[in-house]
Amino acid sequence: MYHHINPHKGDMVTVTPEVFEGQMAYLHNAGYRTLRIDELVSYIKGELSLNQKAAVITFDDGWLDNYIYAFPALKKYSINAAIFIITDRIERASLHNERNNPSSVPTHKESKLLIEKKEDYRVALNWGHIKEMSDSGLVEFYSHTKSHMKCNDLPEDELLEEIGKSKKIIEEKMGRPCPYLCWPYGKYNDTALRIAVNTGYEAIFITGHGVVEKGSDPLAIKRIVVKDSVAWFKNKMVIYINPVLSRLYLMFRKKF
């Protein structure tokens, strides 16, 4: 699970472009198949068999730096990825006609302040970026709700707005179904889950740490937060690709 890809080394939820490219190069050179979300869901349901190493690359929030710094590496190594977008931000960013591709991008803290000031175009993707990335055949886009609210304590009418409206907007803009959702901050409750399922979401991603296996719950797909290190990435991939090592490591990690 990624958020920002930019040069602000050491910043919150950020991987630097050089490290990100190194991680993607490793996946490519080590023979990993990067799955699309449809393929992942088919694998969970037992409808898809995998005879090679596989991984799923996801980004949360839809930051502009994903286009500037991550997209070139994804294209270079033919890596599939999914970005979960916050439609209010995308819509506001798209009100500006220019394709804002700055030579530098703000830190995470600065980005949040710009969002609060409604200057989304300076930090968020717009529909032009999204179309270009989608047209590459490598990057797909799904819902991270309408405005990135925690979904564990909202009334039902607001949940319907957050979960349903974002889905509708993405489907209208992309011209295809949006059956996948990612909870903001990983926060949700039974009511939110029920509304999401009734709205038509078929698989949902959370922030819980773990790997996906056949038979995993498609409504609570776990992920791994990626650190800003190629060595860390390689070591963790060796562990997580092995079912026995993975279970032992996750058991030990949970205990301590």
List each model region and its residues.
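Short, glycine/acidic-enriched loop or turn micro-motifs at the edges of active sites
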Residues: 63-64, 147
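Metal-dependent polysaccharide deacetylase catalytic core of the NodB/CE4 family, i.e.
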Residues: 3-6, 53-55, 75-189, 220-221
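C-terminal active-site subregion of NodB/CE4 polysaccharide deacetylases
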Residues: 1-58, 64-65, 69, 136, ...
